[in-house]
Every structure is written in C-alpha cells, then in structure tokens.
UniProtKB/Swiss-Prot annotation:
GO molecular function, one term: bis(5'-adenosyl)-pentaphosphatase activity
Record-linked InterPro entries: NUDIX_hydrolase-like_dom_sf (IPR015797), NUDIX_hydrolase_CS (IPR020084), NUDIX_hydrolase_dom (IPR000086), RppH (IPR022927)
Protein name listed in UniProt: RNA pyrophosphohydrolase
Motif Nudix box: where in chain: 47-68
Biological process annotations from GO: nucleoside phosphate metabolic process; ribose phosphate metabolic process
Residue ranges of domain Nudix hydrolase in the record: 8-158
EC number: 3.6.1.-
Hydrolase in keyword set: yes
Top-level EC class: hydrolase
Species, as recorded: Afipia carboxidovorans (strain ATCC 49405 / DSM 1227 / KCTC 32145 / OM5) (Oligotropha carboxidovorans)
Hydrolase recorded as keyword: yes
Length: 166
C-alpha cells in the first residue's frame, strides 16, 4: 500500500443547496468510515465525478441521487478547489485506501421546489446516504460536520455567504 502522504486526492463536487430563505440543506449521514465523531454527523451533499462528466453535470446528478431535488438553479461555482485530508486512522478504510482525502469543486444552488420534493430515504431510486435532513443557517454549518471537513466548510461558507438568509 502507498504511503499516506503519497496518496492522491479524490476529485468530487460539493453542493450547497439553499432554499428561498437562504437556509442550507444538511443531511445526517447513514454511516460510513468518515463518521469518527457521533456528535458531527451532518453534511451537505457531495460526490464523485464520473468519466466524461463536467463539474456542473456531476453536481446535478449527485444532488438528485442524494436528495431527489430536481427543482434547482445554479447560483455560483467556487473559484477554487477545496481539499481536505481524512484522518490516517480511517485512510485505509475510506475509498479502499486509494485516496488521502478529497479535492472538491463547490456549487451554490437555489432549491426552487417544495420541501416535499426532497426525499432522502430513496432519492431518485438510489441508495440512501442520509437518514434525516433539515434546513440550517449557513453560519452554523462548520460546527455540524466532522472536524477534518471543518476548514473546507468554513471556506465554502465564506465563498457563498452572499446567498445566506437573515
């Protein structure tokens, strides 16, 4: 197995889904190797980029697969890629030990539908990644995620703060 320091980052997309009031969708994770802290189980949708897929296409697909949200409008794309390292203690279990963390392209997306459109139990027929969800004020997000993702969430909040609600 490669040394942790030599492992690449997995490229993926992250989606900040905002309702018309400027609150952000967060989902409570089903489980998985990233859940090392039971007090921090919430996160925004994120996922991999398929071969041949552009970043916005990946964001739309992943959002549908995780939330069932179809009524959306792109607000902004982050200017930079944001990266995080997963803790060494779970690096061998996450992504079969092939990556040291993720390199993420983030999007701010307006949800224009009714809350009943969101379905995390069986989103668009895909396996559930969340067991619960809610709308949360943007400034609260960094304190709800696992600590190793917190710096990315702080940057995402700063990048998209102009879309926050009161």
């Amino acid at each position: 197995m490669a040394r942790y320091e030599d492992l690449p980052y997995r490229s993926c997309v992250g989606m900040m889904l905002l309702n018309p009031k400027g609150l952000v969708f967060i989902g409570r994770r089903v489980g998985g190797t990233e859940l090392i802290d039971p007090a921090h189980v919430w996160q925004m949708p994120q996922g991999g980029i398929d071969p041949g897929e552009d970043y916005w296409e990946a964001a739309q697909r992943e959002l549908l697969e995780e939330t069932n949200a179809r009524s959306i409008e792109k607000l902004a794309e982050a200017t930079d890629w944001f990266t995080y390292d997963i803790p060494r203690m779970i690096a061998g279990r996450s992504w079969k030990g092939r990556y040291r963390g993720q390199r993420q392209k983030w999007f701010a997306i307006r949800f224009t539908g009714d809350d009943s459109e969101i379905n995390v139990a069986s989103p668009a027929g895909h396996k559930a990644e969340f067991v619960d969800w809610r709308w949360e004020p943007m400034q609260n997000l960094p304190n709800l995620v696992v600590p190793f993702k917190r710096p990315v969430y702080e940057r995402v909040v700063k990048e998209f703060s102009r879309f926050a609600g009161e």
